[in-house]
Each structure stands twice: as structure tokens, then as C-alpha cells.
């Protein structure tokens, strides 16, 4: 059997790393000096929004691929652990400032060139959503790619999936040995630079 990999940090990033390792057959142990979701992952809402599609680059492509894969990935997490992560692909509506129409046209052209067709970005004068922000121009930019997640529920769902798959999560514990460090800014302090 493969040697266990330690992941330091039980926020969304650390737990997601551990879950992906387990999915690939690698035993893992997650440690957190406090508790699951103690840092930024203990927040109320997370937006999973795509980078602006104009001036495309490799970083934007990697992020797009992750957003496209998110539906299935979070569904697998929910199924494995029996806990809803609070993920939904909700789309996004943004008011367009007066005079920004040409810039929005560039953005829409970039989305058409790089995003999957179902993700559609478009301008509208009649948004179909119950909450519509004020738009001085009378235009809104909408997309179907943006998603949202509950960080707290995501952590709970990932922890449940990890435990269901045989992974260990130890709270109130640190590690001195080699690990995947996913401890956020607070965990960087011992490495110097005041976490910067």
C-alpha cells in the first residue's frame, strides 16, 4: 500500500487536495491546528466566477476547466459522503455602466471564443431573475458559467467524503514532517515574512 500523504489545513483547499488524492487511491491524513473550516473557509458564501474572457491566457484556461468540471466534482463529493456541499451553478447578472457597451461586446466575444456554448454570456435588457441590480444603462451582462458554494457546507461535505473513503482528519493537531501545506496565510508565518 502507498505511504500516507499528510495535508496540513482543513479548509476547502486542503480538504479538496485530500479528497482528490483519495479518489486516486492515495491514503491521506489531514491535520489542522484548529478545526475544519477554521480560516477563510468558515465564511458564508463563495463565488466561483470565471475570469473575464477577453485577453485569454493559460491561467484563465485552467480556471475555466475547473469551473466546467465543478458540477460533477461536487456531485461526487456529495454522493461519497452523503452531505450537500451547497454548490449550485446559478449564473451571474451584472449591471453594465453607461458607455461600457463596447467593452462588454469584447467580453462576450471572448466568452464565445473560449467558453463552452452552454455557458453563454450575453447582454440583456430584460433579465430573468428575481433579484435585479440597478443598471443606469438599462443593460445587464449575464452568464451561465458562474457558480456559488457555501464554504462551511463544502468543508463538511469534503470531510464526510474523506472519512467515508477511509481518510483521517485530525483537528487540533499540527505536523512537523513533509506535508501539502494548505494552511492559509496564518500557516505561512513560521516560514518568515509574516505570512507574506
Please place each PLM-identified region on the residue numbering.
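Glycine-rich FAD pyrophosphate-binding loop
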Residues: 23-42
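Short beta-strand/turn micro-motifs composed of small residues
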Residues: 9, 32, 97
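Flavin-dependent oxidoreductases
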Residues: 16, 61, 177-196
